[in-house]
Amino acid sequence: SFGEKGYIDKVSHTIPEFYKELATNPIHPQTSQPVPGDFKRQYQFLSSHYKSILSIHIPNSVSGTMQSAQTAVKRVSGSSVTILDSLNISVGQGLIVTHAARMVKAGKSHDEIVEGINYARENTKVFCCIKDLSYGVKGGRVPGSVKVIADILRISPILTTSSNGKLEKAGAVLGKKNLGKKMVKYMKNKHDVSK
């Protein structure tokens, strides 16, 4: 939401509309998790069409979304819903969900898919480089002093998720230009990319 104006991600506000408002609205957007009732309705609908449901979420450490889903499952009778923590955010979660979808398409059983998701989340690691900390400061997640120091030293922090799903600093690169190339170099230097 931007102040009093609320939106449902990619439903009532397209991605280009969001970024346009982000650039022009002086109010910083805030997110909120879906309420258990939203999950309950989805689970009831899906239960009427499928034998089992896999619900894959971003970690509890960064959002209460999974907790809302767990609360909703307790209110849905006669369904087989498995709530899974992806231990990843953004692209990492998307890769895990895509892996699960491929397993469904391949005809794997519910238990085989859960096992595959657990394997995928243990082997999925995403790194991102933050060019500008302004939105982190506006959202209250980054102290203003950290942004000032990063700007003065021209440092771009690299973030990742820990093994328990918490967002953490992985490193940093110098400069604000050619971050893609710098990230590739960072990955080659710090991590065995041959696996």
Q: Language model features by range: what are they?
A:
Residues 1-5, 61-82, 88-98, 102-195:
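Mixed-charge interfacial surface used for oligomerization/domain docking
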Residues 1-33:
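N-terminal glycine-rich anion-binding loop in soluble enzyme alpha/beta folds
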Residues 30, 55, 83:
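Short catalytic-loop micro-motif centered on adjacent basic/acidic residues
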Residues 31-42:
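Glycine-rich, highly charged phosphate/nucleotide-binding loops
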Residues 40-51, 186-194:
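Glycine-rich phosphate/diphosphate-binding loops that line cofactor/substrate pockets in enzymes
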Residues 52-61:
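Short, glycine-/small-residue-enriched flexible loop/hinge segments at domain edges that mediate gating
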